[in-house]
């Protein structure tokens, strides 16, 4: 059984139906955490809001809805905070209707260059995190990668590709889930960890594999450069 299962999606550009289909597909495949690589940073928030509005069936937001939301916020506030991360034990993901806060917390996302969040110094433009003992870097545009990123990380997730890609350059892997909008096929991807093995695959939204699951032959490093 996989110890970490990470769903990866990118470039939805307002197509909330595709975002929704990708989330449900990846969740059905066991994803516990999600990487949204940009291509309209706010789509995550709008998708959660859209799901909740549709769950009310057109009914207006009521006092009971408000009380329920406050109760959810308070229950989260009472919990011991834990840092967001790609790897580790996490609660089973749910739907935005059941627990929108848990769903949002299960995502890490990177902003694209033409969004306001890209210029916000409080929001990192890249995600650097460990999956098992492998340092990974996630970014919307791979041109934003810097020398230290390339020296230190072994796996790079990036958006802005018309189709899923699994490219090896030396010991490093550049992985893209493809696009949810603006491409011939709407696709997303999955990274699974079993012990020290990492397996990458990509999928159409109808569940057909575009890139079959394949273990990445990684060469682990013994030290990290910090300059």
What is the meaning of each model-derived region?
Residues 9-14, 38-42, 105-107, 140-143, ...:
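Active-site metal-binding loops of divalent metal-dependent hydrolases
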Residues 31, 147-161, 187, 212-227:
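A signal for specific C-terminal beta-sheet/loop modules enriched in small/flexible residues
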Residues 46-48, 113-117, 149, 168-169, ...:
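Short, well-ordered secondary-structure micro-motifs
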Residues 43, 183, 209:
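Flexible, glycine-rich phosphate/dinucleotide-binding loops
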Residues 6, 132, 147, 193, ...:
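Metal-centered catalytic cores of metalloenzymes
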Residues 1-132:
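Core catalytic region of metal-dependent phosphoesterases/phosphodiesterases
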Residues 85-86, 90, 95-97, 135-201:
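Conserved beta-sheet core of the metallophosphoesterase superfamily
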């Amino acid at each position: 059984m996989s110890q970490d299962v990470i769903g990866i999606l990118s470039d939805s550009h307002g197509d909330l139906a595709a975002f929704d289909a990708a989330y449900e597909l990846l969740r059905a495949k066991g994803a516990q955490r999600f990487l949204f690589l940009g291509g309209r940073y706010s789509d995550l928030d709008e998708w959660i809001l859209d799901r909740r509005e549709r769950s009310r069936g057109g009914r207006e937001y009521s006092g009971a809805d408000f009380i329920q939301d406050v109760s959810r916020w308070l229950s989260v506030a009472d919990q011991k905070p834990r840092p967001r991360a790609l790897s580790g034990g996490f609660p089973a993901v749910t739907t935005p209707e059941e627990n929108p806060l848990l769903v949002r917390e299960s995502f890490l996302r990177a902003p694209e260059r033409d969004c306001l969040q890209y210029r916000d110094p409080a929001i990192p433009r890249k995600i650097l995190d460990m999956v098992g003992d492998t340092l990974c870097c996630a970014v919307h545009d791979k041109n934003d990668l810097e020398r230290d990123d390339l020296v230190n990380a072994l796996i790079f997730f990036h958006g802005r590709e018309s189709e899923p890609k699994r490219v090896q350059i030396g010991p490093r892997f550049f992985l893209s889930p493809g696009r949810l909008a603006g491409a011939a096929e709407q696709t997303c991807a999955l990274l699974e960890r079993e012990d020290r093995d990492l397996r990458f695959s990509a999928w159409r939204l109808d569940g057909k594999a575009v890139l079959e699951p394949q273990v990445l032959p990684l060469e682990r490093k013994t030290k990290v450069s910090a300059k």
